[in-house]
Swiss-Prot record:
This is Serine/threonine-protein phosphatase 4 regulatory subunit 2. Signal peptide: none annotated. InterPro entries: PPP4R2. Residues 206-270, 291-311, 331-402 are annotated as: Disordered. Residues 348-358 have a biased composition (Low complexity). Belongs to the PPP4R2 family. Residues 206-248 have a biased composition (Acidic residues). Keywords: Nucleus. It is found in: Nucleus. GO terms for molecular function: protein phosphatase regulator activity. Pfam families: PPP4R2 (PF09184). One of its GO terms (cellular component) is protein phosphatase 4 complex.
């Protein structure tokens, strides 16, 4: 009996839920059915049908008792049913059909939604139609006011034809579509019949113009790209020429500087020898060590200049300002102050030879061959030994003595 203890309640619920017979609500008064139904869903269902735990689900049992009390006070005393009475009977008759055994909380929530209402239930008016025969459908039942005699049928056909003409008003649009389908266009407002052909020709001309414009734009883009490539090639060639000119100018400037230095050195040497009264050829034939060193150093400088001229300077060497300084041996040693003197003053001073160089000479030679360079241009007298020693002394040694 689905846990229902009252046989009378079980029969009523079976008739309502299974047979769908709602006349049972008219046979029994609400004051009798609602108290029995409330006791069943508030006490029997939670304790005997669901898995009830007193420690954890005592609150749910209290909520069901409040619902049963609400139905008795709100509807049973007024002898009325709530409008959800059919759904309440379904949940109370077979609760496990809708909820699992361990879902007592869901059952309580569903009962609260059905019981906490204010609207009363009212019986349905009229007779229930089972709709067993398809001809009993309203859409298939013939209309009563239409008669089926022959006269009415003739008049009905004329009436229907009038209705179709009124409803199917198209205001000439259908005829216009039919004419277009035939391939002819009767344009009365324009005054010519070949309007469609003219439009086709215009579209073709527009397409040709667009194609020509696209072709011209493509050609212009190709020409611009070629011009840019040519300009870039010209710029690269100009840059290479500028770099080559700069390197040539640098090499020419170095050659000119080296020539000026050689000329100045040669002029100083020639002037000094001329002022001393000794020809250049005789000076070069001297067997002294100083003359040999001067000639060899001059030849080495010329070889070095030729090697520098033969080599072309690279562009990257322009940033290298740490040039190597070469020390030139002029054949005589003097102080920096005397080296800056003009040529006339420099010539007036007597030429001096380092004692280190003079000491390396062969002692077997006579004094005349060693002091040949100390002959005065005004007289042919030889310089005394004391004067020779004084002249051959280095200025640096005099400074140390002081």
């Amino acid at each position: 009996m689905m846990g229902i203890k009252s046989r009378h309640l079980y029969d009523r619920l079976t008739k309502i839920v299974i047979d769908k017979d709602l006349s049972a609500f008219n046979e029994i008064s609400p004051s009798q059915l609602i108290p029995q139904l409330s006791e069943h869903f508030s006490i029997t269902i939670p304790k005997e049908i669901f898995n009830y735990n007193e420690d954890q689900e005592e609150d749910l049992l209290h909520r069901l008792k409040e619902l049963s009390r609400y139905l008795v006070v709100k509807f049973a005393k007024r002898d009325k049913y709530p409008f959800t009475i059919q759904r309440i009977c379904e949940l109370s008759y077979h609760p496990l059909q809708y909820f699992p055994v361990h879902s007592l909380q869901k059952f309580v929530s569903a009962m609260e939604k059905c019981c906490l209402v204010n609207t009363d239930w009212t019986p349905r008016l009229g007779k229930e139609c089972p709709n067993t025969n398809p001809m009993e459908d309203v859409s298939l039942i013939p209309i009563e006011w239409i008669r089926t005699n022959k006269e009415d049928e003739k008049s009905l056909q004329a009436f229907i034809s009038k209705i179709e003409t009124i409803v199917a008003v198209n205001f000439g649009y259908d005829d216009f579509d039919d004419d277009n389908e035939d391939g002819t266009d009767h344009d009365i407002g324009r005054g010519y019949d070949n309007h469609g052909d003219v439009l086709i020709e215009e579209y073709e001309e527009m397409d040709e113009e667009f194609e020509d414009e696209d072709y011209e734009d493509h050609e212009d883009e190709e020409e611009d790209e070629e011009d840019e490539d040519n300009d870039s090639d010209v710029d690269e060639m100009e840059a290479e020429e500028v770099e080559e000119d700069a390197s040539d100018d640098i090499s020419i400037g170095e050659i000119a500087e080296n020539d000026d230095q050689d000329n100045a050195h040669t002029d100083v040497t020639d002037t000094q020898l001329k002022y001393n009264g000794v020809p250049i050829e005789e000076e070069l034939r001297l067997s002294s060590t100083s003359s040999v060193l001067s000639v060899s150093s001059h030849a080495a400088n010329e070889d070095e200049n030729e090697s520098i001229l033969s080599r072309k300077r690279n562009v990257t060497e322009l940033d290298d300002y740490q040039y190597k300084e070469t020390k030139e041996n002029d054949g005589f040693i003097t102080t920096p102050k005397k080296s800056k003197m003009p040529l006339n003053e420099f010539g007036s001073s007597s030429s001096m030879v380092s004692p280190v160089v003079s000491n390396q000479e062969d002692p077997s030679r006579n004094d005349d061959s060693r002091i040949n360079t100390f002959i005065s241009p005004d007289t042919t007298n030889s310089v005394t030994q004391a004067e020779k020693n004084e002249l051959s002394t280095s200025p640096l040694q005099d400074k140390k003595r002081m």
